[in-house]
């Protein structure tokens, strides 16, 4: 028990000092699935997201899976027609789309016109900055009431949340989640890292 406490303390401290990898490349330790667990598989060191709607919520020890001011970067590859998303400031929900936080869109060729790094339904971009079947870095920073998204270092969204927003889609302490959108979508995540500020 003492060793577990020391490990958790170290992970929490080290997350404040550097980037911490949340995917281990072997299994889904530290993550919790909703709706359709089979939509999330680890294959050849990558998280493969393919199947019916579901969400994979980070539920591990880093930051006690509740982040306030933080950065996330993920290495992502989409396949033709795929749609996914990376939620921030969210909370576990057993069914349906997460009702808290914001979704950062992952979509380079799906019929939904909102493209990768859009702050879904809030600040959307139709510009396609990366292509299917190539790895790219998706970066998100949440600080105070400010969200920034980038693709391969290029800023896509620079959003300041209006004062007084109290419900649903708002910046609040929470976890991150990866979306399985539909059975025709296939996305791979090679790395998901977080840095607590």
Give a label for each model feature.
Residues 1-3, 17-18:
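Absolute protein N-terminus
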Residues 3-13:
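Sec-dependent N-terminal signal peptides
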Residues 17-197:
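Carbohydrate-interacting regions of secretory-pathway proteins
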């Amino acid at each position: 028990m003492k060793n577990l406490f020391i490990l958790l303390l170290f992970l929490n401290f080290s997350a404040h000092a550097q980037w911490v990898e949340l995917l281990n490349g072997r299994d889904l330790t530290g993550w919790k699935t909703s709706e359709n667990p089979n939509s999330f598989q680890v294959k050849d060191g990558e998280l493969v997201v393919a199947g019916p709607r579901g969400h994979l919520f980070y539920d591990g020890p880093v930051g006690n899976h509740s982040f306030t001011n933080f950065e996330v970067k993920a290495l992502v590859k989409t396949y033709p027609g795929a749609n996914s998303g990376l939620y921030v400031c969210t909370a576990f929900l057993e069914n349906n789309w997460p009702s808290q936080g914001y979704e950062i869109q992952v979509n380079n060729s799906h019929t939904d016109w909102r493209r990768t790094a859009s702050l879904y339904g809030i600040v959307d971009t139709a510009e396609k900055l990366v292509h299917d079947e190539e790895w790219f870095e998706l970066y998100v920073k949440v600080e105070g009431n400010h969200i920034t998204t980038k693709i391969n270092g290029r800023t896509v969204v620079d959003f300041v949340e209006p004062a007084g927003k109290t419900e649903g889609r708002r910046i609040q302490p929470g976890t991150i989640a990866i979306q399985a959108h539909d059975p025709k979508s296939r996305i791979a995540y090679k790395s998901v890292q977080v840095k607590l500020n």
